[in-house]
Amino acid sequence: MIIKGSNFSVMDNSGARKVQCIQTLEGKKPTSLLRVGDKIVVVIKKMEKRKGGKYKLKVKKSDVCYAVIVKSKQPVRRKSGIIVNAGENGVILLTKTKEPIGTRLTGVVFKEVQRTGLLKNVSISKYII
């Protein structure tokens, strides 16, 4: 069950590892359940460790960003009758203009993300389930 206050893993190379949902977007009530493809506002809780300092991280700890949910522990039922779920809740971080912050996605992305209209998120992912 994904609600306000849920923790997520970040599935891109923006530099963040763990985030927490602080607000829902697009007319959803704060108490409503969120699904794959919904947009949320998150705060960054944990960052990846920099080794050598050769590259600059795109976000900092305690930054507030937009995100879209790309996979969830909660089972998702499709029209064909197939039920899919993941081992963890995952998001992709977005800018204010709804463009992805990272340039590469790690892990799988559920096909339900396509209904959000964010086609660039789907195009940079390797695995779509």
Swiss-Prot record:
Cellular compartments annotated: Mitochondrion
InterPro entries linked: Ribosomal_uL14, Ribosomal_uL14_bac-type, Ribosomal_uL14_sf
SUPFAM superfamilies in the record: Ribosomal protein L14 (SSF50193)
Gene Ontology molecular function: any one: structural constituent of ribosome
Keywords: Mitochondrion, Ribonucleoprotein, Ribosomal protein
Gene3D superfamilies registered for this protein in UniProt: Ribosomal protein L14 (2.40.150.20)
Gene Ontology terms: cellular component: mitochondrial large ribosomal subunit
SMART domains in the record: Ribosomal_L14
Major site of localization recorded for this protein: mitochondrion
Gene Ontology BP annotations: translation
Similarity field: Belongs to the universal ribosomal protein uL14 family.
PANTHER family: 50S/60S RIBOSOMAL PROTEIN L14/L23, LARGE RIBOSOMAL SUBUNIT PROTEIN UL14M
Subunit structure, as described in the record: Component of the mitochondrial ribosome large subunit (39S) which comprises a 16S rRNA and about 50 distinct proteins.
Protein name per Swiss-Prot or TrEMBL: Large ribosomal subunit protein uL14m
Organism (species): Dictyostelium discoideum
